[in-house]
Curated annotation (Swiss-Prot):
Belongs to the UPF0122 family. Might take part in the signal recognition particle (SRP) pathway. This is inferred from the conservation of its genetic proximity to ftsY/ffh. May be a regulatory protein. InterPro entries: RNA_pol_sigma_r3/r4-like, UPF0122, UPF0122_fam_protein, WH-like_DNA-bd_sf. Disulfide bonds: none annotated. Signal peptide: none annotated. This is UPF0122 protein TTE1463. It comes from the Bacteria.
Length: 117
């Protein structure tokens, strides 16, 4: 359940701007501000079922965008590769004695840190 929650918020980070204003508002209230469906219903003066339907449409839209574009998957794969490269750099730094090579490695590590803080 928590993984679904995190995945939905990650999808929202990438594709949230593609949702309608109402879907975005309801999604943010539910996922980001931790309102219940009933609370959202009262605040927006719509039925609980209406809130549920709008939230479900938003979730379906986000999943559809990911299915078609795959940006989240690509991002996650890139982050894994960056971590692997950082581990390799660390091992090389521990074994390398040449100062020039160490400087190059330090520069590479710094650039990777900028990509993945």
């Amino acid at each position: 359940m928590e993984d679904d929650f995190l995945f939905m918020t990650l999808l929202y980070d990438f594709y949230g701007a593609l949702l309608t204003d109402k879907q975005r508002e309801i999604f943010e209230m539910y996922y980001l501000n931790d309102y219940s469906l009933g609370e959202i219903s009262e605040i927006l003066d719509i039925s609980r079922q209406g809130v549920y339907d709008a939230l479900k449409r938003a979730e379906d839209s986000l999943e559809f965008y990911e299915e078609k574009l795959g940006l989240v998957k690509k991002h996650q794969e890139m982050m894994k590769k960056i971590e692997k490269i950082k581990e390799c750099i660390k091992l090389i730094k521990e074994r390398e004695k040449d100062e020039e090579i160490l400087k190059i490695i330090e520069d590479m590590a710094r650039e990777l840190e900028e990509l993945n803080p």
